[in-house]
Amino acid sequence: GQCRIAPLHSCLVADDTMSAIAQRLASLGITLPSVAAPAAAYVPFVRTGNLVFVSGHIAKRDGKPWVGQLGLTMGTEEGQAAARAIAIDLLGTLQAAAGDLAKVRRIVKVMSLVNSTPTFTEQHLVTNGCSQLLVEVFGPEVGSHARSAFGVAQIPLGACVEIELIAEVQ
């Protein structure tokens, strides 16, 4: 089905036929959120040509920043859960940018910042929480992507993880 939305709102399927992506989201029990209002002087995404640059999204739990530092107050599994939660928020923003997730041709790149101690070395495993969900939703040909994962000393609002992405759309 064709997904028509107004910016900053969640997706509403326009007919009885769900797209394969909408079906995957439903089977995973995922409802995409509305685009969150920026916390500073930036926009949630920029579309130029066929590329969409989605601004960094921080991990949230119960609507508040998911605060913590990997290697001190959080372990890898909790970090992965935070990264997966971010992926859901990123998908909501990407849907607003593209008009329909079925228009996504490729997740090009994911960049992850992990609030971690100097001795924590599993940023790549934390980021898998996001990467794996993108592949689950889009399949390996569209969802697999280039990626960077960095350990950083701090993230805005004390969040444990921040992730941004670049996607190619129709």
For each feature predicted by the language model, list its residue ranges:
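Short, polar/acidic, helix-capping and beta-turn segments at strand->helix junctions
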Residues: 17-170
